[in-house]
Amino acid sequence: MKKLATLMTAVVLVMMSATMVSCGESDDYDYYFDLDRALTEYFNRYGDFGTDDRTTADWFDHYYPYASDYDYRSFINAVNADINNSRTTMARYLNGEWEGPLRMYFKNQAGQTVYTDYQVIWHFELSASSDVKGRGTEYRYNEDEGETRTNFSWCVNGYGGIEISYDPSQSGQDPVNMHIAYNNLDKLSTTHFKGTSVGVNIEEEDDFNLTKRLPQRVKGETTAVAAGKTFGGKKADDKTAPVERNITIKNGHR
Protein backbone atom coordinates (compact mmCIF):
# COMPACT_ATOMS: atom_id res chain seq x y z
CA MET A 1 0.00 0.00 0.00
CA LYS A 2 2.83 2.33 0.92
CA LYS A 3 4.56 1.55 -2.38
CA LEU A 4 1.34 2.33 -4.28
CA ALA A 5 0.96 5.72 -2.54
CA THR A 6 4.57 6.59 -3.32
CA LEU A 7 4.07 5.62 -6.95
CA MET A 8 0.91 7.74 -7.26
CA THR A 9 2.71 10.74 -5.76
CA ALA A 10 5.52 10.38 -8.29
CA VAL A 11 3.04 10.19 -11.16
CA VAL A 12 1.28 13.37 -10.01
CA LEU A 13 4.60 15.25 -9.75
CA VAL A 14 5.62 14.15 -13.24
CA MET A 15 2.25 15.25 -14.64
CA MET A 16 2.52 18.66 -12.93
CA SER A 17 6.04 19.12 -14.27
CA ALA A 18 4.97 18.18 -17.78
CA THR A 19 2.01 20.55 -17.59
CA MET A 20 4.20 23.47 -16.52
CA VAL A 21 6.75 22.82 -19.27
CA SER A 22 4.02 22.36 -21.84
CA CYS A 23 2.38 25.65 -20.84
CA GLY A 24 5.62 27.57 -21.28
CA GLU A 25 6.34 26.02 -24.66
CA SER A 26 2.78 26.71 -25.80
CA ASP A 27 3.12 30.42 -24.98
CA ASP A 28 6.26 30.69 -27.08
CA TYR A 29 4.75 28.68 -29.89
CA ASP A 30 1.48 30.60 -29.93
CA TYR A 31 3.19 34.01 -30.39
CA TYR A 32 2.92 35.12 -33.99
CA PHE A 33 4.14 38.42 -35.40
CA ASP A 34 1.66 39.65 -38.01
CA LEU A 35 3.79 41.78 -40.33
CA ASP A 36 0.90 43.01 -42.47
CA ARG A 37 -1.01 44.14 -39.40
CA ALA A 38 2.05 45.91 -37.98
CA LEU A 39 2.58 47.78 -41.26
CA THR A 40 -1.06 48.83 -41.43
CA GLU A 41 -1.02 50.11 -37.84
CA TYR A 42 2.29 51.91 -38.34
CA PHE A 43 1.31 53.76 -41.51
CA ASN A 44 -2.12 54.56 -40.07
CA ARG A 45 -0.33 56.20 -37.15
CA TYR A 46 2.48 58.01 -38.98
CA GLY A 47 1.23 58.44 -42.54
CA ASP A 48 2.45 57.25 -45.92
CA PHE A 49 6.12 58.03 -45.24
CA GLY A 50 6.43 56.99 -41.61
CA THR A 51 8.55 58.83 -39.07
CA ASP A 52 12.16 58.98 -37.81
CA ASP A 53 14.16 55.88 -36.86
CA ARG A 54 14.08 56.44 -33.08
CA THR A 55 10.32 56.98 -32.96
CA THR A 56 9.80 53.95 -35.19
CA ALA A 57 11.89 51.74 -32.89
CA ASP A 58 10.08 53.00 -29.78
CA TRP A 59 6.70 52.41 -31.41
CA PHE A 60 7.65 48.87 -32.38
CA ASP A 61 9.01 48.03 -28.90
CA HIS A 62 5.85 49.39 -27.27
CA TYR A 63 3.33 47.51 -29.39
CA TYR A 64 5.36 44.36 -30.09
CA PRO A 65 7.43 43.70 -26.94
CA TYR A 66 7.70 39.96 -27.64
CA ALA A 67 8.85 40.30 -31.24
CA SER A 68 12.27 38.97 -32.13
CA ASP A 69 15.15 40.82 -33.75
CA TYR A 70 14.26 39.02 -36.95
CA ASP A 71 10.69 40.34 -36.72
CA TYR A 72 12.00 43.88 -36.27
CA ARG A 73 14.37 43.63 -39.22
CA SER A 74 11.56 42.25 -41.37
CA PHE A 75 9.35 45.13 -40.28
CA ILE A 76 11.96 47.80 -41.08
CA ASN A 77 12.73 46.27 -44.46
CA ALA A 78 9.03 46.22 -45.30
CA VAL A 79 8.57 49.84 -44.16
CA ASN A 80 11.45 50.98 -46.38
CA ALA A 81 10.11 49.00 -49.33
CA ASP A 82 6.65 50.51 -48.87
CA ILE A 83 8.08 54.03 -48.70
CA ASN A 84 10.17 53.45 -51.83
CA ASN A 85 7.08 52.17 -53.63
CA SER A 86 5.20 55.32 -52.60
CA ARG A 87 8.03 57.53 -53.89
CA THR A 88 8.02 55.69 -57.21
CA THR A 89 4.25 55.95 -57.52
CA MET A 90 4.27 59.69 -56.77
CA ALA A 91 6.96 60.26 -59.41
CA ARG A 92 4.95 58.30 -61.96
CA TYR A 93 1.87 60.37 -61.11
CA LEU A 94 3.83 63.60 -61.60
CA ASN A 95 5.19 62.43 -64.93
CA GLY A 96 3.34 64.39 -67.62
CA GLU A 97 1.82 67.84 -68.06
CA TRP A 98 -0.24 69.75 -65.48
CA GLU A 99 -2.19 72.99 -65.90
CA GLY A 100 -4.05 75.37 -63.62
CA PRO A 101 -3.90 78.48 -61.42
CA LEU A 102 -0.99 79.41 -59.17
CA ARG A 103 -1.03 82.22 -56.60
CA MET A 104 2.42 83.54 -55.63
CA TYR A 105 2.73 85.30 -52.24
CA PHE A 106 5.50 87.82 -51.58
CA LYS A 107 6.15 91.27 -50.10
CA ASN A 108 6.29 94.36 -52.24
CA GLN A 109 8.82 97.19 -51.85
CA ALA A 110 6.58 98.82 -49.23
CA GLY A 111 6.77 95.70 -47.08
CA GLN A 112 3.17 94.70 -47.71
CA THR A 113 2.22 91.08 -48.26
CA VAL A 114 0.74 90.79 -51.73
CA TYR A 115 0.16 88.10 -54.30
CA THR A 116 0.14 87.67 -58.04
CA ASP A 117 -2.05 85.19 -59.89
CA TYR A 118 -0.71 83.15 -62.78
CA GLN A 119 -1.85 80.42 -65.10
CA VAL A 120 0.84 77.76 -65.20
CA ILE A 121 1.77 74.61 -67.05
CA TRP A 122 4.18 72.26 -65.30
CA HIS A 123 5.73 69.60 -67.50
CA PHE A 124 7.39 66.76 -65.57
CA GLU A 125 9.49 64.16 -67.35
CA LEU A 126 10.73 61.16 -65.39
CA SER A 127 14.38 60.30 -65.91
CA ALA A 128 15.19 57.11 -67.79
CA SER A 129 17.81 56.30 -65.13
CA SER A 130 15.75 56.98 -61.99
CA ASP A 131 12.33 56.08 -60.61
CA VAL A 132 11.98 59.19 -58.45
CA LYS A 133 13.45 62.20 -60.27
CA GLY A 134 13.71 63.94 -63.61
CA ARG A 135 13.59 67.21 -65.51
CA GLY A 136 10.77 69.59 -66.28
CA THR A 137 9.63 72.96 -67.60
CA GLU A 138 7.39 75.61 -66.05
CA TYR A 139 5.34 77.91 -68.30
CA ARG A 140 3.90 80.83 -66.31
CA TYR A 141 1.55 83.50 -67.68
CA ASN A 142 -0.53 86.50 -66.73
CA GLU A 143 -1.64 89.54 -68.73
CA ASP A 144 0.71 92.00 -67.02
CA GLU A 145 3.93 90.00 -67.32
CA GLY A 146 3.27 87.83 -70.34
CA GLU A 147 4.74 84.35 -70.46
CA THR A 148 7.93 83.04 -68.90
CA ARG A 149 9.52 79.64 -69.39
CA THR A 150 11.90 78.07 -66.89
CA ASN A 151 13.44 74.61 -66.85
CA PHE A 152 13.89 72.73 -63.60
CA SER A 153 15.08 69.52 -61.98
CA TRP A 154 12.80 67.64 -59.60
CA CYS A 155 12.71 64.64 -57.29
CA VAL A 156 10.49 62.95 -54.71
CA ASN A 157 12.50 62.62 -51.48
CA GLY A 158 12.29 59.93 -48.81
CA TYR A 159 9.75 61.90 -46.80
CA GLY A 160 7.29 62.32 -49.67
CA GLY A 161 8.37 65.89 -50.36
CA ILE A 162 8.69 67.15 -53.92
CA GLU A 163 11.86 69.18 -54.50
CA ILE A 164 12.02 71.53 -57.49
CA SER A 165 15.22 73.35 -58.46
CA TYR A 166 14.77 75.95 -61.19
CA ASP A 167 17.72 76.45 -63.52
CA PRO A 168 19.73 79.69 -63.16
CA SER A 169 18.48 82.50 -65.36
CA GLN A 170 20.57 83.93 -68.19
CA SER A 171 21.03 87.08 -66.13
CA GLY A 172 23.18 85.13 -63.70
CA GLN A 173 20.65 84.87 -60.89
CA ASP A 174 21.15 81.88 -58.58
CA PRO A 175 18.85 78.87 -59.07
CA VAL A 176 15.60 79.01 -57.11
CA ASN A 177 14.78 75.96 -55.01
CA MET A 178 11.16 75.27 -54.05
CA HIS A 179 9.89 72.49 -51.81
CA ILE A 180 6.45 70.91 -51.57
CA ALA A 181 6.58 69.19 -48.18
CA TYR A 182 4.29 66.20 -47.83
CA ASN A 183 2.28 68.00 -45.16
CA ASN A 184 1.79 70.85 -47.67
CA LEU A 185 0.43 68.48 -50.30
CA ASP A 186 -3.36 68.54 -50.44
CA LYS A 187 -3.67 65.94 -53.15
CA LEU A 188 -1.69 64.10 -55.78
CA SER A 189 -3.49 61.59 -57.96
CA THR A 190 -3.31 60.65 -61.61
CA THR A 191 -5.55 63.64 -62.42
CA HIS A 192 -5.18 66.25 -59.65
CA PHE A 193 -2.18 68.01 -58.08
CA LYS A 194 -2.86 70.59 -55.36
CA GLY A 195 -0.75 72.04 -52.57
CA THR A 196 1.71 74.72 -51.46
CA SER A 197 5.34 75.09 -52.50
CA VAL A 198 7.71 76.97 -50.18
CA GLY A 199 10.98 78.62 -51.14
CA VAL A 200 14.15 77.02 -49.77
CA ASN A 201 16.60 79.78 -50.71
CA ILE A 202 14.01 82.44 -51.47
CA GLU A 203 11.12 83.61 -49.29
CA GLU A 204 8.13 82.79 -51.43
CA GLU A 205 5.07 80.60 -51.11
CA ASP A 206 2.91 79.44 -54.00
CA ASP A 207 -0.53 77.87 -53.78
CA PHE A 208 -1.40 75.79 -56.85
CA ASN A 209 -4.32 73.69 -58.04
CA LEU A 210 -3.54 71.76 -61.22
CA THR A 211 -5.18 69.10 -63.33
CA LYS A 212 -3.45 66.58 -65.57
CA ARG A 213 -3.41 67.80 -69.14
CA LEU A 214 -1.27 65.16 -70.82
CA PRO A 215 0.03 61.92 -69.31
CA GLN A 216 3.66 61.10 -70.01
CA ARG A 217 4.54 57.48 -70.54
CA VAL A 218 7.72 56.12 -69.06
CA LYS A 219 10.13 54.54 -71.53
CA GLY A 220 9.36 50.86 -72.00
CA GLU A 221 5.72 51.19 -70.94
CA THR A 222 2.85 50.66 -73.33
CA THR A 223 0.15 52.27 -71.18
CA ALA A 224 -0.12 55.31 -68.94
CA VAL A 225 -0.18 54.94 -65.15
CA ALA A 226 -3.50 53.56 -63.94
CA ALA A 227 -5.51 55.39 -61.29
CA GLY A 228 -4.82 54.11 -57.79
CA LYS A 229 -3.74 55.53 -54.45
CA THR A 230 -4.16 59.25 -53.76
CA PHE A 231 -1.34 60.97 -51.85
CA GLY A 232 -1.74 63.92 -49.51
CA GLY A 233 -0.30 64.87 -46.13
CA LYS A 234 -2.16 68.09 -45.37
CA LYS A 235 -5.05 67.89 -42.93
CA ALA A 236 -7.86 70.43 -42.89
CA ASP A 237 -6.71 72.00 -39.59
CA ASP A 238 -3.18 72.46 -40.97
CA LYS A 239 -4.31 74.95 -43.59
CA THR A 240 -3.75 78.57 -42.62
CA ALA A 241 -4.28 81.80 -44.51
CA PRO A 242 -0.99 83.26 -45.78
CA VAL A 243 -1.67 86.87 -44.81
CA GLU A 244 0.94 86.87 -42.01
CA ARG A 245 3.76 85.38 -44.04
CA ASN A 246 7.03 87.21 -43.61
CA ILE A 247 8.33 87.26 -47.15
CA THR A 248 11.15 89.37 -48.54
CA ILE A 249 12.07 88.70 -52.13
CA LYS A 250 14.67 90.46 -54.22
CA ASN A 251 12.98 92.40 -57.04
CA GLY A 252 9.53 91.48 -55.74
CA HIS A 253 9.36 87.82 -56.80
CA ARG A 254 11.10 85.28 -59.01
Describe the predicted segments one by one:
Residues 1-22:
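Sec-dependent bacterial lipoprotein signal peptides
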Residues 76-84, 158-254:
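Beta-sheet ligand-binding and adhesion/scaffold domains
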Residues 35-49, 66, 105, 138, ...:
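Calcium-binding acidic motifs and repeat modules
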Residues 109-161:
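N-terminal glycine/threonine-rich, aromatic-flanked beta-hairpin/loop signature
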Residues 99-107, 135-141, 165-169, 196-200:
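Generic short beta-strand segments
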Residues 17-66, 70-86, 207-215, 242:
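Bacterial Sec-dependent N-terminal signal peptides
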